[in-house]
Each structure stands twice: as structure tokens, then as C-alpha cells.
């Protein structure tokens, strides 16, 4: 949607991971003037934020990093010293994981709403996808319907007839679908980071690494980043490509 001066403006949440980076590629390809918004919320490591900076620089978009500390709230392996268990691939997504951060999307989207109003943006883009809403309550389609209704009542711009809408274009996409889209859009996948752990290489054993590699395998592509440990299923896949 165009704003008053004819330019399409949007805020796109950017963590530096596969999903949000592919999303930024998509939003840029649609012709939006984008402000990429990242959050330093007290997560265990800054590796993903480093990737977010590189992705934003690659696309030459304005990039804001908001510092908010969610650690006092607790309740998540991403902000507390709670171990992230190794879960079998087939069991990932069956329960709400320990990496769920209480009310994170509501908090982050509320900040994005303020930025969208100030920048006269009509859209807030978030990279939630099909796998997310199987495990995270704030990534479900009904959640986004509800938050859009709330946001329509929450700002001066919207109550005066303006429009700000949260959109999750990848909501029905699997990881493999996202990888295919990223390849099509020439997203710089080698700059992205999905691992729950910091370090020079992704661990290859956390849920996020396994799901990422499974997505590349099912998409028929090879992940360009390096891993400390390569899961057996992905090794087998790589052997079939040689």
C-alpha cells in the first residue's frame, strides 16, 4: 500500500536468520522502501545480529537495532541459562519448545508498530512460517488476525483513517519452500545465521540447525554455511549430490 507521497514504505523484522533474511529479499523485490528492524533483547549471543547487519548492508536498507532486555522476564532458553535439548527431527514442533520467549512477538511487533507510524509505513513484515505456528502460539494465523485488529485501534495514524498492517508472507511456507524462494530471489544465504549457539560455525545439532538443513535437503540445495557437526541425514544427502 502506498503512503501519502506515493512511496511504498514498510518495516521488516530482521533477525539475521534464514526466514527473516528471505523475507527482506521478498519485501525489497516488491518495491518497498524498507526499514529493517532488529532487536538485541538479551539473547545468548550476538551472532545472529551480526548477520542481520550484513544482510541489511547487502540490500542497502536502513537498519535499526533496538535494545530491549527480556532477560528479567525469563522463561526461555534463548535468554536464560536453560539448556537447549537435542530433539529428534521427527519430534520437533510437536510441543512448545524451551526456546519460546514469552510474548516475544507481541512485544517486538508493538515496537515495530511505533516505528511504522513514525516512518509513515503501511506494512510491518514478519517472517513467521508454517513450522513456527506448529510450535509457537504467537505465530499462528489467528494471532496475526487478532493483532491486526488491535493495531488498527492503537495509533493516531490508524484511528485517523491511515493503515498499518502486519503481514506474514511466509506463513504457509515450509522450510524447503523458504529455501526455494531464497534461491529464486538470490538471497545471500551464506550471510544468514540460524543456530541457537554462537561461534564461528553453526553447531548442527540444535533444533534450528536441523530444521534449516532439512529445508535445504528437501529443496534440493546445499547450505553454504559451515557446521561443527553435520547430521547423518544431511551427510547422506550430500553424498547423493556428489
List each language-model region with its residue ranges.
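Short Fe-S-cluster ligation motifs
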Residues: 210-212, 216-242
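Local cysteine-cluster metal-coordination motifs and their immediate loop/turn environment
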Residues: 110, 193-214
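Short, charged low-complexity linear segments at domain edges
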Residues: 170-197, 234-241
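Charge-dense, low-complexity polyampholytic segments
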Residues: 124, 196-203, 221-229
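Compositionally biased, intrinsically disordered low-complexity regions
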Residues: 76-77, 206, 222
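ATP-dependent adenylation/nucleotidyltransferase module used to activate substrates
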Residues: 2-185
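Secondary-structure transition/capping residues
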Residues: 123, 158, 189, 217-220
Amino acid at each position: 500500500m502506498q503512503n501519502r507521497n506515493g512511496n511504498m514504505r514498510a518495516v521488516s523484522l530482521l533477525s539475521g536468520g534464514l526466514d527473516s533474511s528471505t523475507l527482506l529479499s521478498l519485501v525489497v523485490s516488491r518495491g518497498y522502501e524498507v526499514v529493517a528492524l532488529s532487536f538485541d533483547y538479551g539473547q545468548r549471543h550476538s551472532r545472529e545480529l551480526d548477520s542481520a547487519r550484513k544482510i541489511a548492508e547487502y540490500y542497502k536498507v536502513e537498519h535499526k537495532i533496538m535494545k530491549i532486555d527480556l532477560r528479567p522476564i525469563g522463561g526461555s532458553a534463548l535468554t536464560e541459562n536453560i539448556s537447549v535439548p537435542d530433539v529428534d527431527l521427527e519430534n520437533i514442533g510437536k510441543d512448545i519448545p524451551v526456546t519460546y520467549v514469552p510474548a516475544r512477538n507481541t512485544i517486538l511487533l508493538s515496537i515495530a508498530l511505533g516505528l511504522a507510524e513514525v516512518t509513515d509505513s503501511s506494512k510491518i513484515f514478519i517472517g513467521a512460517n508454517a513450522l513456527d505456528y506448529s510450535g509457537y502460539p504467537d505465530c499462528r494465523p489467528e494471532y496475526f488476525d487478532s493483532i491486526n485488529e488491535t493495531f488498527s485501534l492503537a495509533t493516531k495514524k490508524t484511528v485517523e483513517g491511515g493503515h498499518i498492517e502486519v503481514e506474514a508472507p511466509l506463513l504457509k511456507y515450509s522450510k524447503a519452500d523458504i529455501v526455494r524462494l531464497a534461491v529464486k530471489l538470490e538471497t545471500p544465504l551464506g550471510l544468514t545465521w540460524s543456530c541457537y549457539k554462537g561461534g564461528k560455525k553453526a553447531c548442527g545439532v540444535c533444533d534450528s540447525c536441523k530444521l534449516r538443513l532439512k529445508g535445504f535437503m528437501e529443496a534440493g540445495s546445499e547450505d553454504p554455511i559451515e557446521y561443527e557437526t553435520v547430521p547423518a541425514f544431511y551427510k547422506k544427502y550430500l553424498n547423493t549430490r556428489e
